[in-house]
């Protein structure tokens, strides 16, 4: 991918920081004022370059529709790939009209350690930019307790966002119900057994005999890990 100039990186970093702090991107005028770019045309030139290079997605109809891409997150140090790299701050409160922010219900807690019961009631709601979840619509959040998934960047106090589904591919991070208690692990299907594997090397996996495994054990697949603003 084509590299960025120092000024383009500065613009991209400002857009990302405004989304992090406020939950929505800045206007063109706000970018110009913050970075001492005297004309809106000058700001637009930088935005067009960022879009052309694949670091920014824009909606020309909306002044605040400036969405950093996955390449932008990598350029800014956010990484990419598995669940732990998809970490963004959470923003509380209702989504602004016309924004791309969507509200996600937080329905309880889940263990990244010993399994605990996940309470099926809405405790809170948070909002994230829709582009982070792609086409995933049936998504809910669970607060993580325990440290068995720290190898995947899932830390105690984080929220995992979970796509509701009853199946999973080998190696995916799932929320599973085992003996009426919920836990988050990677799942592996191994002949006559199913292995729920932590990513903390100090933790042991949980094994379920294939004959005892039911599709209802899978509550969903983790599609993101989110950290609330402090």
Curated annotation (Swiss-Prot):
HAMAP family given in the database record: LexA
Quaternary structure note: Homodimer.
Family: Belongs to the peptidase S24 family.
Catalysed reaction equations from the record: Hydrolysis of Ala-|-Gly bond in repressor LexA
Record keywords, A-Z: Autocatalytic cleavage, DNA damage, DNA repair, DNA replication, DNA-binding, Hydrolase, Repressor, SOS response, Transcription, Transcription regulation
Protein name per Swiss-Prot or TrEMBL: LexA repressor
DNA-binding region: 28-48
Function, as annotated: Represses a number of genes involved in the response to DNA damage (SOS response), including recA and lexA. In the presence of single-stranded DNA, RecA interacts with LexA causing an autocatalytic cleavage which disrupts the DNA-binding part of LexA, leading to derepression of the SOS regulon and eventually DNA repair.
GO MF, any single term: serine-type endopeptidase activity
EC number(s) per entry: 3.4.21.88
GO biological process, one term: negative regulation of DNA-templated transcription
Enzyme class: hydrolase
Site (Cleavage): 112-113
InterPro entries in alphabetical order: LexA, LexA-like, LexA/Signal_pep-like_sf, LexA_DNA-bd_dom, LexA_repressor, Peptidase_S24_LexA, Peptidase_S24_S26A/B/C, WH-like_DNA-bd_sf
Entry annotation: catalytic residues: 148 (for autocatalytic cleavage activity), 185 (for autocatalytic cleavage activity)
Keyword Transmembrane helix among UniProt keywords: no
């Amino acid at each position: 991918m084509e590299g960025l100039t120092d000024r383009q990186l500065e613009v991209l970093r400002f857009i990302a920081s405004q989304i992090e702090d406020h939950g929505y991107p800045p206007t063109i005028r706000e970018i110009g004022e913050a970075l001492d770019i005297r004309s809106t045309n000058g700001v637009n030139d930088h935005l067009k370059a960022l879009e052309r290079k694949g670091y920014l997605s824009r909606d020309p109809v909306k002044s605040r529709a400036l969405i950093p891409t996955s390449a932008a997150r990598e350029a800014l140090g956010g990484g990419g790939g598995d669940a732990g790299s998809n970490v963004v701050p959470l923003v509380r409160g209702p989504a602004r009209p016309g924004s791309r922010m969507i509200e996600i219900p937080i329905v309880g807690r889940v263990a990244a350690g010993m399994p605990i019961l996940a309470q099926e009631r809405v405790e809170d709601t948070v909002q994230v930019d829709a582009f982070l979840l792609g086409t995933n619509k049936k998504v809910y959040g669970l607060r993580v307790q325990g440290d068995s998934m720290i190898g995947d960047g899932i830390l105690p106090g984080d929220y995992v966002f979970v796509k509701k589904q009853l199946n999973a591919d080998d190696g995916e991070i799932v929320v599973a119900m085992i003996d009426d208690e919920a836990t988050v692990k990677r799942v592996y299907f191994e002949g006559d057994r199913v292995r729920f594997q932590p990513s903390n090397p100090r933790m042991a996996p949980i094994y379920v005999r294939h004959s005892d495994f039911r599709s209802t054990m899978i509550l969903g697949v983790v599609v993101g890990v989110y950290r609330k603003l402090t």
